[in-house]
UniProtKB/Swiss-Prot annotation:
The keyword Ligase does not apply. GO terms for molecular function: aspartic-type endopeptidase activity; peptidase activity. The gene is sxa1. GO terms for cellular component: endoplasmic reticulum; external side of plasma membrane; plasma membrane. Involved in degradation or processing of the mating pheromones. Its loss may cause a persistent response to the pheromones. It may cleave the mating pheromone M-factor. May be involved in processing of zymogens that are required for zygote formation. It comes from the Eukaryota. Gene3D superfamilies: Acid Proteases. Residues 76-434 form the Peptidase A1 domain. This is Aspartic proteinase sxa1.
Length: 533
């Protein structure tokens, strides 16, 4: 990014401060923050968004439940209610981003030329009217003139975040009311995006719910400097408010719906044991990464294109760090791993970096196992990895959601996470993985276990049974120790030529270069030196 952009960014924030000063009331004390619930259903045939509102509700166990909603933007969306006017905002769930932000009603476009000195090969970006139509008509944008929103008391008044698909947002750090299914979270801090760059090749992001651990992004101070900024995460804010007792959460996703539980996980969704895998250690890592030891391809069919009547399993050594990321749609693995998988079906790796095979080279019983060690093996059907089928005179061709990843960023996205139950506990440096109960649904009765309790007796390599030997009390506060949110999915699609369509949030970013949309640029010190050079 060029230095003039950051001068411009500070000016833009100063202008924003002047224009909205009268809209803010500095009320002493902490704000009450609550999240209301809304559920939407996914139409598999039409592949279109449907929104069906439901009332606030609590699970029979007493835990608050928040439904997420399906959209066509390639992600899982949570409905977060903010403001004294209690409006609902659809925000992308992202385990690779720390900050929760929402788009402002008066959002204006950033052009590529305002951000980058060299714009060769860079999309010019969407116009202001286009962004407002996509973000504020299809979703809900934040209107700070009709709510009790106010700036935070921090000296860092603004934030700047850039993502792997080049999406860039600039805005204010805010405090306002929020609503969590009958629970109040005092003084909820979030970002309000007032300027945004979106490529015309991808869907507009209406906002993000950041589920990663706290990490440093770019901030803008009240004395007009670019500074390092570590925003409070939504998980940490729930802990600080004594709503949950541990900064951990469990995630259940499938093609239609899903569920996010802060502070706990749902035993009813799990078949067998939870396998606890160590988070990969790194001095600068702040992502939910684990070591993937190997992949096993199990073939069990014959076809017109593959002559062998019976094929044995093929073990492929990987032994590399991979990041679990709900903000990423596909699976990104080392180049030689992807090529080995393609070879098992006499397929190829396309120029776009994904596996292409004949559809009759596999059966419904074929699967790929992801092996994390200590019997932590999880199967994904090859059929479930198909993102597009193309008719051909020599036989239908299937494109798989397996991509060659960038060497600095191997990712297990939604095409993996839909087939496991995942639990994230940064403090314990553990990620729990479990096979899904085939009868699990987000509407079934919850059987919630506290993550802290589950991990007390766990050591490296051990698993925790989904059926506890002792009953555990999880009503640690008057609110309980877990929050339950449910989700619905947003699949991406692939065009006939194999390139990702604009429905995917990774279309021109992660899909082409293997970089997650959630990979925030963390370079504040560099920006300061550029600004004052």
């Amino acid at each position: 990014m060029k230095a003039s952009f950051f001068v411009f960014a500070i000016s833009a924030l100063q202008a924003l401060q002047a224009s909205v000063a009268s809209a803010y009331s500095e009320v002493p004390g902490k704000r009450s923050v609550v999240l209301n619930l809304q559920h939407s259903q996914y139409d598999h045939v039409a592949r279109k968004l449907e929104r069906t509102k439901v009332l606030n509700k609590r699970d029979s166990s007493g835990y608050p439940v928040l439904d997420l909603e399906y959209t066509d933007a390639g992600g899982y969306f949570a409905n977060l209610t903010l403001g004294s006017n209690e409006r609902v905002y659809s925000l992308t769930l992202d385990t690779g981003s720390p900050y929760t932000w929402v788009t402002a009603k008066n959002i204006t476009a950033l052009s590529a030329s305002e951000i980058w000195s060299d714009t060769d090969g860079v999309d010019a970006g969407r116009s202001t009217s286009d962004i407002r139509t996509n973000a504020c008509t299809n979703y809900t944008c934040f209107d700070y003139s009709s709510t009790t929103a106010r700036r935070t008391n921090s000296s860092t008044i603004g934030f700047l975040a850039s993502y792997g698909d080049n999406t860039t947002v600039l805005g204010y750090n805010m405090v306002d009311n929020a609503y969590f299914a009958g629970l109040t979270l005092p003084g909820f801090e979030f970002g309000l995006a007032t300027r945004e760059y979106d490529s015309s090749q991808i869907s507009v992001t209406p906002g993000i719910i950041g589920l990663s651990v706290a990490m440093t992004i770019t901030g803008i101070s009240s004395d007009d400097k670019v500074v390092a900024f570590t925003p409070p995460t939504i998980v940490d804010q729930l802990v600080s408010a004594n709503v949950i007792d541990t900064p951990a959460f469990g995630i259940y996703l499938n093609e239609d719906v899903g569920e996010l539980i802060f502070g706990g996980y749902d035993k009813a969704k799990i078949n067998g044991s939870v396998h606890w895998v160590n988070i990969s250690s790194s001095d600068d890592s702040t992502f939910y990464s684990v070591n993937l030891e190997s992949i096993t391809v199990t073939n069990s069919t014959s076809s017109n294109n593959v002559q062998s009547s019976k094929r044995s399993s093929k073990d492929i050594e990987v032994n590399t760090t991979v990041t679990l990321d709900t903000g990423t749609v596909y699976i990104y693995l080392p180049e030689d791993t992807v090529e080995s998988i393609a070879d098992q079906y006499q397929g190829i790796v396309s120029e776009y970096g994904y596996v292409v095979i004949y559809c009759d080279s596999f059966s419904d019983s074929d699967y790929i196992s992801f092996n994390f060690g200590s019997d932590a093996d999880f199967h994904v059907s090859v059929n479930d990895l198909v993102i597009y089928r193309q008719e051909s005179t020599s036989g239908d061709i299937c494109y798989l959601a397996l991509f060659e990843g960038d060497t600095s960023s191997y990712l297990l996205g939604q095409y993996f996470l839909q087939y496991v139950y995942s639990i994230y506990d940064w403090d314990a440096q553990k990620i729990g993985l479990a096979a899904l109960n085939s009868n699990a649904t987000s509407t079934a009765n919850h059987q919630i276990l506290n993550i802290n309790s589950a991990l007390r007796s766990v050591t490296s390599g051990q698993s925790v049974s989904a059926t506890p030997t002792v009953s555990m009390s999880i009503a640690a506060t008057s609110f309980g120790s877990s929050l339950v949110l449910t989700a619905s999915a947003s699949p991406s699609s692939t065009s006939v030529d194999g390139s990702s369509s604009s429905d995917s949030s990774e279309a021109s970013g992660a899909a082409s270069v293997g970089v997650s949309i959630s990979a925030i640029v963390l370079c504040a010190s560099t920006l300061i030196s550029l600004l004052f050079a």
